[in-house]
Amino acid sequence: MEQPRIVNLNELPPATDREHGEKFASSHVPIGAPLGARKLGYNLTEIPPGKRAFPYHFHHVNEELFLILSGTGELRWPGGTAPLKAMDLICCPPGPDSAHQIFNNGSVPLRYLALSTTEDPEVVEYPDSGKYGVTVGRKLGGTPAESKFRVIAFKKDQVDYFAGE
């Protein structure tokens, strides 16, 4: 008989920290594997004051949901910005109308639970920079960099289908 799939967020392993430039910093604790998840991805994310976890983006395939646990912040989306506080839920279905970015505009860390479908392959677009990313073969709980195939490029650098053939 299987054991219940229960994980206490206060008893998770240490977070993996990510930082890039002046704008981006966050820590992430994957919780899908400890839960035994098979079709959904979960992680606990914390963003320090004045930072963002990720660039403004949207997914073509996967849907995301965020539950703000503590702190305050701001959601950037195609319609502008919206304030965030503890117990707010944010749903981001696939598509450009759900482009999103969470910014910690508060004075304490912003913590949230991130939940997503894990369909593969995935295509993500970054409207601010004109980039896109494609991943194929990403393992549940793995990072995009660990995918079997991954490319991040500028859309303007596209080539003709037969180029180089």
Go through each PLM region and give its residues.
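A short, N-terminal "cap"/entry segment at the start of jelly-roll beta-barrel domains
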Residues: 1-39, 125-165
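Conserved short histidine dyad/triad with adjacent acidic residue
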Residues: 27-30, 43-59, 97
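Short, conserved beta-strand element in jelly-roll/cupin
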Residues: 44-48, 59-77, 115-119
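A generic structural motif
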Residues: 53, 63, 70-72, 79, ...
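Short acidic-glycine-tyrosine-enriched beta hairpin
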Residues: 79-95
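Ligand-binding loop in jelly-roll beta-barrel domains
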Residues: 95-122
